[in-house]
């Protein structure tokens, strides 16, 4: 079987695609990806065999390509970083194709943290963007906030099932229901990061109640306290 790559192509702007990922895509014969992801790399798709997938048909397409791959090279691009929020898909790709080479990309989490000026080394990163239960992740969010960490969080859009839908408004009510004073909690929400449609919101968690945001959004709970190296200088 030929080579198979899972690559991260950044949050949405072609400017955030790394050189190594560009090389892999240009080298590949077959590209399999979601519509939004393919749009990010559209200039690199000339003369490629391209398959646009959805959640409904992805298994069928992966199986089809696996059977006919031969000595060809296949790249499967993911929005952001392939190592974040995509483990369920990557695990399945490994089951289907065997060896899959993983090339990281720039995550919207990194961009959101930078824009909010919240350092990752003082933060907890949590993704609710999974199909499995998120109850433990909800507890993880509570603990991180109680422990004084900033939190960069990817919410879970699931509009067809309100019991699984856990976006900004649901998160705000959840935290309030669990004893947090959300009127005093600073939060950023970024949508469509790095693209022409990028928007940002800054306010309190309480402000998020009944407010709607895009599926392509990231939250940053800001509890950062500046600590420069000068504060730790010793004689």
Task: Give the ranges of each region predicted by the language model.
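Class I S-adenosyl-L-methionine
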Residues: 1-103, 110-111, 207-209, 217-218
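A contiguous loop/helix-start segment that scaffolds small-molecule binding in enzyme catalytic cores
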Residues: 2-6, 74, 145-235
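A short, acidic, amphipathic alpha-helical segment used as a generic capping/interface helix at domain edges
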Residues: 64-68, 134-143, 173-175, 207-208
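Positions that flank functional sites
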Residues: 40, 108, 128, 159, ...
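Class I SAM-dependent methyltransferase SAM-binding "motif I" and its flanking Rossmann-like core
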Residues: 13, 80, 84-149, 199-202, ...
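Secondary-structure boundary/capping motif
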Residues: 16-17, 85, 133-134, 162-163, ...
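Structural motif
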Residues: 33-36, 54-56, 79-81, 129, ...
């Amino acid at each position: 079987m030929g080579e198979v790559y899972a690559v991260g192509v950044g949050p949405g702007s072609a400017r955030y695609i790394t050189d190594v990922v560009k090389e892999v895509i240009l080298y590949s014969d077959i590209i399999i990806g979601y519509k939004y992801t393919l749009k990010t790399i559209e200039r690199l798709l000339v003369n490629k065999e391209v398959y646009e997938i959805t959640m409904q048909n992805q298994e069928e397409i992966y199986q089809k390509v696996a059977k006919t791959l031969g000595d060809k090279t296949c790249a499967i691009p993911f929005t952001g970083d392939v190592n974040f929020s995509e483990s369920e898909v990557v695990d399945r790709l490994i089951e289907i194709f065997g060896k899959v080479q993983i090339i990281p990309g720039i995550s919207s989490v990194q961009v959101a943290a930078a824009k909010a000026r919240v350092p990752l080394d003082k933060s907890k990163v949590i993704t609710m963007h999974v199909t499995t239960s998120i109850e433990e992740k909800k507890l993880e969010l509570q603990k991180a906030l109680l422990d004084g960490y900033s939190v960069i969080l990817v919410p879970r859009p699931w509009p067809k099932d309100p019991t699984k839908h856990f976006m900004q408004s649901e998160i705000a009510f959840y935290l309030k229901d669990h004893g947090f004073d959300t009127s005093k909690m600073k939060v950023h929400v970024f949508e469509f990061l790095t693209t022409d449609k990028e928007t940002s919101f800054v306010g309190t968690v309480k402000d998020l109640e009944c407010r709607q945001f895009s599926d392509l959004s990231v939250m940053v709970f800001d509890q950062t306290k500046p600590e420069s190296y000068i504060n730790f200088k010793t004689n």
